């Protein structure tokens, strides 16, 4: 390859000095190869380093001069005003709680306050328990082996039940409900009263079976009335014999 062709090719590109990375686009930064590397950070002052060697892209290694450091005016301008670092105006930053309600900012630790409030309520409930309302179905039921008290009927209830018994000793389910509602009793109480009344009638009449119909009951009453004079005569005869 001829030198003429190489020279014509490289004449279109920049030299090695201009190919060095330029970190900050400043008009005052020129010939950075002869200056120490400047590192910018969050601190106010710029720190710099003196590397022993910098590998050149095209001209090989070259030693740096140890001349006293002079701060670049571009570095002062760039570091002094971080807002204009890239040529833009600084952004107006707002506080995290600036747009919120001031009351919320005042009580930032809401979770701890809520937890403490719940703890106080739990302690208060343990110290002063509120009385609970007891319903009849919530009370303990009577034991299986425990005997219930004897049911007492008023004179009015007994009279009405006797009338119903004379009219019909056996009640249907519908009539039993009507009688229980009229007398203020339960169906079970009415049923038990009629069972006891039929057993009492059997003992009084010396019958093993209660009459199932009203006609049979009337016949039994007639027989009882016919036997009454005979029993009276027998009683008078016994009294005469004793005299």
Curated annotation (Swiss-Prot):
Annotated region Disordered: the residues are: 203-243
InterPro entries reported for this sequence: Antp_homeobox_TF, HD, HD_metazoa, Homeobox_Antennapedia_CS, Homeobox_CS, Homeodomain-like_sf, HTH_motif
**Record-linked SUPFAM superfamilies:** Homeodomain-like
For the motif Antp-type hexapeptide, give the residue ranges.
134-139
Q: Write out the annotated subcellular location.
A: Nucleus
**Record's Gene Ontology CC terms?**
nucleoplasm
Q: Name one GO biological process term.
A: negative regulation of myeloid cell differentiation
Q: Which GO terms describe its molecular function?
A: DNA-binding transcription repressor activity, RNA polymerase II-specific; sequence-specific DNA binding; sequence-specific double-stranded DNA binding
- Residues in the DNA-binding region annotation: 146-205
Cite the entry's keywords alphabetically.
Developmental protein, DNA-binding, Homeobox, Nucleus, Transcription, Transcription regulation
One short Pfam name that applies is Homeodomain
Under the subunit heading, UniProt states: Forms a DNA-binding heterodimer with transcription factor PBX1.
Q: Which family does it belong to?
A: Belongs to the Antp homeobox family.
Cited PANTHER family: HOMEOBOX DOMAIN-CONTAINING PROTEIN, HOMEOBOX PROTEIN HOX-B8
Role according to the record: Sequence-specific transcription factor which is part of a developmental regulatory system that provides cells with specific positional identities on the anterior-posterior axis.
Could you tell me what this protein is called? Homeobox protein Hox-B8
């Amino acid at each position: 390859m001829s030198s003429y062709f190489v020279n014509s090719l490289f004449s279109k590109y920049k030299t090695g000095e201009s190919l060095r990375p330029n970190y900050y686009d400043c008009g005052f930064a020129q010939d950075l190869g002869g200056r120490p590397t400047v590192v910018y950070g969050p601190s106010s002052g710029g720190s710099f380093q003196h590397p022993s060697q910098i590998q050149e892209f095209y001209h090989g290694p070259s030693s740096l001069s140890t001349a006293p450091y002079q701060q670049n005016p571009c570095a002062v301008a760039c570091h002094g005003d971080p807002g204009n670092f890239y040529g833009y105006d600084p952004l107006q930053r707002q506080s995290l709680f600036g747009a919120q309600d001031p009351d919320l900012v005042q009580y930032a630790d809401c979770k701890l306050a809520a937890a403490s409030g719940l703890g106080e309520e739990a302690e208060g409930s343990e110290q002063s328990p509120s009385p609970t309302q007891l319903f009849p179905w919530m009370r303990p039921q009577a034991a299986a082996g425990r005997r219930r008290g004897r049911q007492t009927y008023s004179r009015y209830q007994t009279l009405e039940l006797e009338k119903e018994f004379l009219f019909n000793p056996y009640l249907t389910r519908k009539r039993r409900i009507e009688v229980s509602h009229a007398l203020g009793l339960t169906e079970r109480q009415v049923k038990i009263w009629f069972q006891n009344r039929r057993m009492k009638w059997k003992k009084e009449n010396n019958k093993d079976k209660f009459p199932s119909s009203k006609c049979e009951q009337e016949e039994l009453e007639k027989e009882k009335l016919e036997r009454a004079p005979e029993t009276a005569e027998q009683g008078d005869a016994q009294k005469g014999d004793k005299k």
